[in-house]
From Swiss-Prot:
InterPro entries: Calcineurin-like_PHP_ApaH, Metallo-depent_PP-like, PP1_catalytic_subunit, Ser/Thr-sp_prot-phosphatase, STPPase_N. GO terms for molecular function: metal ion binding; protein serine/threonine phosphatase activity. Belongs to the PPP phosphatase family. The active site is at H123. It comes from Caenorhabditis elegans. The keyword Transmembrane helix does not apply. The keyword Magnesium does not apply. Keywords: Cell projection, Chromosome, Cytoplasm, Differentiation, Hydrolase, Manganese, Metal-binding, Protein phosphatase, Spermatogenesis. This is Serine/threonine-protein phosphatase PP1-delta. SUPFAM superfamilies: Metallo-dependent phosphatases. Mn(2+) 2 binds at D90, N122, H172, H247.
């Protein structure tokens, strides 16, 4: 039997939980979260491995369970379906409200599948979110490791890359030395926890490095770092203008690389409570012109904890 969900009702309760998160477990039960995962999984499975979308659209980077900052993004830009969104992954781990964050986003995906797009980040992989907070949160708040496992089943169906207006290639991490054509991205297998090595693992993990030419091993211990020459070569070969990725904290929320052929977007201000970085989102208008909105970290006097 296909799972069904009253998505409006669930969204309303998630939006009313507030920033403390204290009311989540009393207002949303585990079975509802499992159903939300199941329905979201079917939506991801119905769409392509390379999401080919048209502007206008807002592109957002890492969120990392910073629920109040996710809501700031919607408050500033508008809510779907009036505004289209593409998120570049890393919804969970490190922040304090991972479950609210990922479930609200799944609700938007279910309700507005053609207006709200979510790529997978490296933190939507079990080896990572088992360690960096999401597993612990599922266990602490719902006393359930099964809930955590069901989230992994949904994450395994999430797409790894997107293409805006045929000109802006999007992924969480970076490029791959094995990437030669867009058709390779269209044919990426799902469901899958991408193996190492693979194009998939590079899309999740790779980083640009201004001191490197070509490809070198990544100090993260997985995938590669790549130079400006690689970005120029890939843009030429794939006939694209820009690569948009996330995966790294940048002080102003966005940072260009390779003569503006690549941009890093990071959308979690005051990341981990340890950095004083701003966040940013990138708006791509109907004419493929990109502009950035910055979100300053909340003043220290207003922060909790």
């Amino acid at each position: 039997m296909t799972a069904t969900i009253d998505v409006d009702n669930l969204m309303s309760r998630l939006l009313n939980v507030g920033m403390s998160g204290g009311r989540l477990t009393t207002s949303v039960n585990e079975q509802e979260l499992q159903t939300c995962c199941a329905v979201a999984k079917s939506v991801f499975a119905s769409q392509a491995s390379l999401l080919e979308v048209e502007p206008p659209i807002i592109v957002c980077g890492d969120i990392h369970g910073q629920y109040s900052d996710l809501l700031r993004i919607f408050d500033k830009n508008g809510f779907p379906p009036d505004i289209n969104f593409l998120f570049l992954g890393d919804y969970v781990d490190r922040g304090r409200q991972n479950i609210e964050t990922i479930c609200l986003m799944f609700c938007f995906k279910i309700k507005y599948p053609e207006n709200f797009f979510m790529l997978r980040g490296n933190h939507e992989c079990p080896a990572i979110n088992r360690v960096y907070g999401f597993y612990e949160e599922c266990n602490r708040r719902y006393k359930s490791t099964r809930l955590w496992s069901i989230f992994q089943d949904t994450f395994n169906w999430m797409p790894l890359c997107g293409l805006i207006g045929s000109r802006i290639l999007c992924m969480h991490g970076g490029l791959s030395p094995h990437l030669q054509t867009l058709d390779q991205l269209r044919q990426l297998p799902r469901p899958q926890d991408p193996p190492n090595p693979s194009i998939g693992i590079d899309l999740l993990w790779a980083d640009p490095d201004q001191w490197v030419k070509g490809w070198q091993a990544n100090t993260r211990g997985v995938s590669y770092v790549f130079g400006q020459d690689v970005v120029a070569d890939v843009c030429s070969r794939l006939d694209i203008d820009l690569v948009a990725r996330a995966h790294q904290v940048v002080q102003d929320g966005y940072e260009f690389f390779a003569s503006k052929k690549m941009v890093t977007i990071f959308s979690a201000p005051h990341y981990c409570g340890q950095f004083d970085n701003s966040a940013a989102t990138m708006k791509v208008d109907e004419n493929m012109v990109c502009t950035f909105v910055m979100y300053k970290p909340t003043p220290k006097s207003l922060r909790k904890g």
